[in-house]
Amino acid sequence: MQKSTPPEDLSRLTLLGREAKPSRKLETFPNRHPDRDYIVTMETAEFTCVCPMTGQPDFADLHISYIPDASILESKSLKLYLWSYRNEGIFHEHVTNVILEDVVAALSPRWCKVTANFGVRGGISITVEAEYKKPGWSKP
């Protein structure tokens, strides 16, 4: 088995190593271990969007975990994707589910879970968990 990343894995990546600006494009590269179930977790404490009613900023710790099938999510594209919500007026529950849907559309993972822990607003914190399981796949 090859130890380093083959050049063909890099050929589809258009955001890595380029100027950073918000983008709704999620990029992937091939999973070199598709025969194994393993969990990839990506986290950020810097997710922001805004309340669609007040325009006030909402801050969240965001955790995306998935068991890849054929593809792996490229982290810079995820960073730019999440950045694109910075000024988006969207409810917590909706944005968490949209992120899950977009990650699933990009990856077609065996399993994926997005957890968003939003900061306290009006004395209440909100945690939203959205989960996807590929039809026919069962967690070992």
UniProtKB/Swiss-Prot annotation:
Pathway: tRNA modification; tRNA-queuosine biosynthesis. It holds the Pfam family QueF. The keyword Oxidoreductase applies. It catalyses: 7-aminomethyl-7-carbaguanine + 2 NADP(+) = 7-cyano-7-deazaguanine + 2 NADPH + 3 H(+). GO terms for biological process: queuosine biosynthetic process; tRNA modification. Its EC number is 1.7.1.13. One of its GO terms (molecular function) is preQ1 synthase activity. Catalyzes the NADPH-dependent reduction of 7-cyano-7-deazaguanine (preQ0) to 7-aminomethyl-7-deazaguanine (preQ1). This is NADPH-dependent 7-cyano-7-deazaguanine reductase. It comes from Syntrophus aciditrophicus (strain SB).
